[in-house]
């Protein structure tokens, strides 16, 4: 009976080991050409406990790497390889040496010929196979390149001349892909070679693991034609547009609770809002340099958005009177102002009945300070507000204003703030000297700048939403995402990089679309400090990894819509996931490629990220996952329930 053989060609030792120990089918082939590992690593890989047979190969040896080929194959044999693929391009004396080692270690011998340019004559191929069997091969492998049907017919014509199950003959290239199937279905070839994904094929025309999943393994299929606009981007752009004098057009806007709250704040700042389809026309009337910040009332209502609250607290210092910041729902339970002492250095007094919780009243006048050190451990949102407010501050300083931030978390959100500020003509350059620590930033800028309206600015698609859909595709689907900016400053674009590092079955097309399919996920370690909104996507991905994954940096999750680390663990455990927070403060998740959760009732705790992650987990569960409040997903993606139903092929009543 033919065996599935996973072909792995990577110099990443940990990745190779994870696949060897986690692949649950028949054989894993390690292509040793790129594996410039230490001897101890080769020994460890080929001697490790595993559920599969392990094949060592060095497919294309040349004079330049012949010594490496023989040495690596020898070490693999001595360390416990079950099969060794010895190329006929290796000199005869070295082949005999390798075959002797294999015989002594009980390792099956494959003698192979690979032609990467054409398919030679049938007689030549037949003589080559006969010679390999006479040399002592257990299996002979003849692989050529097909240009058309005649080449395919020629390679498959070898089978009747040799014992069943001992010849592996097929053609590479797209024209030859069908020979791979016919070799096993009609001719009982010993193996069919699969790649982990399309970008990790070892040859053109090779099938991938995805092609051999059962239909029930791929419950999630389809296109996400329009991801929501990034609320992180939209909120910053809306507020900055309201701080201008003149009209800004913001394209590709999609409403969500937090972005709509930003529009209400803009109106409280005196801006006029006109909606033209998915375009926002925002006309601001501020002249902060001459008049200070003008508000319609003494209160700014920010809805449920912590970002808005933290942007508005420093901005309130540009008004000429006390301003009260207030909100609603879960925001009233969140500590929104951890920087009262810092703000006092800039002349602001922040007061409230509950220390640091809304409502808060800001009084005083914002004044620049030449050099201010900031401990950024409480996040970047208030610092973003300071960058905007200080840039617009009409009080001029004789010296440039410096903000020196250390222990910075969510640092990429500061980069996003600076990018959007730049669109509106506000300059906040990094300090030119090298920063030794990625979690340190020094900004310097002049005060008294004027925000200028933008003729046209497109909202970026939301990478937080995209990350969850990409994780869902990698775990159980075939999903295509449209409209993403791969050069985005949004922190959650890191998910794309993680999936590439994971060798996920991911393809980026020329038009920018991204397709991701279920492949083989290996366990991973990830520090979530700078990307706290990725937690749901990471858990979904980890649940389908072949082993234990670890997420650190959970401190950033305690002051979200819920105590996010705690509630994610509680609710995913409620539906059958194996995950826990250890004494070291890290989250450990046990996964399995075929794992099915129990399902059942669970709570979103009013947290839109948790609600969406649990809804995705429904596709990995035996029973329906029933969430008490999926509607809270509207905080960032109102159309999420309908979009997910479309991908699952369900009709919503």
What positions do the PLM features span?
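Glycine/small-residue-rich loop that forms an oxyanion/phosphate-binding "nest" at active or ligand-binding sites
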Residues: 53-97, 300-304, 318, 323-325
């Amino acid at each position: 009976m033919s065996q599935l053989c996973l072909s792995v060609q990577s110099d990443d030792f940990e990745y190779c080991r994870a696949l060897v120990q986690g692949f649950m089918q028949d054989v894993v082939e390690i292509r040793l050409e790129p594996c410039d590992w230490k001897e101890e690593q080769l020994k460890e890989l080929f001697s490790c406990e595993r559920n599969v047979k392990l094949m060592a190969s060095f497919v294309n040896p040349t004079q330049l790497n012949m010594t490496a080929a023989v040495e690596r194959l020898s070490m693999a044999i001595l360390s416990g390889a079950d099969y060794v693929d010895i190329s006929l391009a290796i000199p005869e004396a070295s082949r005999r040496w390798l075959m002797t080692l294999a015989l002594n270690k009980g390792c099956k011998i494959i003698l192979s010929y690979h032609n990467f340019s054409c398919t030679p004559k049938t007689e030549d191929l037949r003589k080559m196979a006969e010679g390999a069997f006479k040399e002592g091969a257990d299996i002979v492998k003849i692989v050529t390149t097909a240009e058309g049907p005649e080449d395919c017919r020629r390679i498959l014509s070898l089978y009747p001349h040799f014992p069943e199950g001992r010849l592996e003959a097929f053609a590479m290239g797209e024209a030859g892909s069908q020979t791979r199937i016919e070799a096993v279905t009609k001719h009982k070839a010993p193996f069919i070679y699969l790649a982990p994904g399309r970008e990790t094929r070892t040859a053109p025309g090779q099938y991938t693991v995805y092609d051999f999943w059962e239909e029930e393994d791929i419950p999630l299929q389809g296109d996400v034609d329009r991801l929501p606009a990034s609320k992180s981007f939209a909120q910053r752009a809306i507020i900055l547009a309201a701080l201008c004098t003149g009209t800004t057009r913001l394209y590709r806007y999609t409403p969500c609770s937090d972005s709509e709250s930003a529009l209400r704040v803009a109106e409280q700042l005196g801006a006029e809002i006109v909606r033209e389809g998915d375009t926002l026309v925002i006309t601001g009337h501020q002249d902060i340099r001459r008049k200070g910040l003008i508000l319609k009332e003494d209160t700014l209502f920010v809805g449920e958005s912590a970002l808005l609250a933290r942007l508005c607290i420093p901005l309130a210092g540009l008004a000429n009177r006390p301003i009260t910041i207030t909100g609603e729902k879960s925001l009233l339970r969140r500590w929104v102002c951890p920087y009262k002492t810092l703000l006092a250095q800039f002349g602001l007094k922040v007061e409230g009945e509950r220390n640091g919780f809304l409502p808060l009243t800001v009084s005083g006048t914002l004044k620049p300070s030449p050099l201010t050190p900031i401990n950024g451990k409480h996040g970047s949102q208030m610092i973003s507000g300071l960058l905007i407010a200080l840039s617009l501050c009409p009080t001029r300083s004789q010296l440039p204003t410096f903000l020196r931030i250390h222990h910075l978390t969510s640092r990429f959100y500061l980069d996003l703030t600076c990018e959007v500020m730049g669109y509106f003509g506000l300059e906040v350059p990094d300090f030119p000297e090298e920063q030794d620590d990625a979690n340190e930033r020094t900004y310097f800028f002049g005060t008294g700048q004027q925000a200028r309206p933008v003729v046209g600015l497109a909202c970026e698609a939301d990478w937080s939403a995209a990350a969850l859909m990409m994780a869902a595709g990698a775990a159980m689907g075939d999903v295509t995402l449209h409209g993403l900016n791969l050069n985005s400053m949004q922190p959650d674009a890191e998910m794309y990089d993680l999936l590439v590092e994971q060798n996920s079955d991911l393809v980026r097309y020329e038009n920018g679309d991204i397709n991701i399919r279920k492949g083989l996920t290996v366990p991973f370690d990830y520090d979530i400090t700078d990307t706290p909104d990725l937690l749901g996507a990471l858990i979904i991905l980890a649940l389908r990894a072949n082993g234990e994954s670890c997420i650190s940096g959970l401190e950033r999750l305690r002051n979200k819509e819920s105590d996010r680390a705690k509630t994610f663990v509680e609710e995913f455990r409620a539906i059958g996931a194996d995950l826990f927070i250890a004494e070291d403060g890290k989250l450990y998740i046990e996964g399995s490629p075929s794992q099915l959760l129990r399902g059942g009732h669970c709570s979103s705790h009013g947290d839109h990220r948790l609600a969406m992650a649990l809804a995705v987990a429904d596709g990995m569960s035996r029973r329906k996952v029933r969430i008490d409040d999926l509607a809270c997903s509207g905080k960032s993606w109102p159309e999420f329930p309908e979009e997910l139903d479309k991908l699952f092929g369900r009709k919503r009543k």
